[in-house]
Design a protein with these regions (language model features):
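N-terminal glycine-rich phosphate-binding loop and ensuing alpha1 helix
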Residues: 2-53
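Residue-level signal for inorganic ion chemistry
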Residues: 7, 33, 80, 95-96
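Active-site glycine-centered loops adjacent to acidic/histidine catalytic or metal-binding residues
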Residues: 11, 96, 125
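Acidic metal-phosphate-binding loop of nucleotide-sugar-dependent transferases
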Residues: 14, 97-101
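Conserved beta-strand scaffold positions in the cores of enzyme catalytic domains, especially
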Residues: 24, 66, 119-121
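Conserved N-terminal catalytic core of the sugar/cofactor nucleotidyltransferase
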Residues: 32-89
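Short aromatic/hydrophobic "clamp" motif used to bind/position activated sugar donors
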Residues: 92
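Conserved core of the sugar-phosphate nucleotidyltransferase
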Residues: 102-148
């Protein structure tokens, strides 16, 4: 196992309109970002977890490294990748701290698929109708070819 989990938690959540940053909102008695960290730790898939944030956070787990993020998401991702580039991880998972509703099983499936592929992206099929508005016409889209 040579995996790294990068958790992006430096965002401002401009659309969220709260004094508290979304990733730090308390949910089930802990900050939202901690749900993702806990799942990454419980999965036993990762040698290291990199928390990218612009807030002052201290965590005691030695697997977790905390680094300063950038102004934009891509800058935070790049800072994290530069931070780990000499560590020779086989796989790197990058996730958004404000979206903790993934399962440990999903992490394990992604890891398994990385044994056969260079990159993987999780998705779900849609069940609802999907429409496309183009040149004053509403066009029905084939749900079997649309994923979230």
């Amino acid at each position: 196992m040579s995996n790294c989990f990068i958790l992006l938690a430096a965002g401002k959540g401009k659309r969220f309109k709260s004094k508290t940053l979304k990733q730090f909102i308390n949910y089930k008695n802990k900050p939202l970002f901690m749900h993702s960290i806990d799942k990454a730790l419980k999965s036993n898939l990762f040698n290291e977890i990199v928390l990218v944030t612009n807030s002052k956070i201290k965590l005691k787990n030695k697997k977790i490294k905390i680094i300063k993020g950038g102004k934009e998401r891509y800058q935070s991702s790049l800072k994290a990748l530069n931070f780990i580039k000499n560590k020779k991880f086989k796989n790197v998972f990058i996730h958004d701290a404000a979206r903790p509703n993934f399962s440990i099983n999903l992490l394990k499936k992604l890891s398994k698929h990385l044994n056969k592929n260079n990159a993987v992206v999780p998705f779900i099929n849609i069940n609802s109708s999907a429409k496309y508005f183009y040149k004053n016409k509403i066009i029905n889209l084939n749900r079997e070819k649309i994923f979230l």
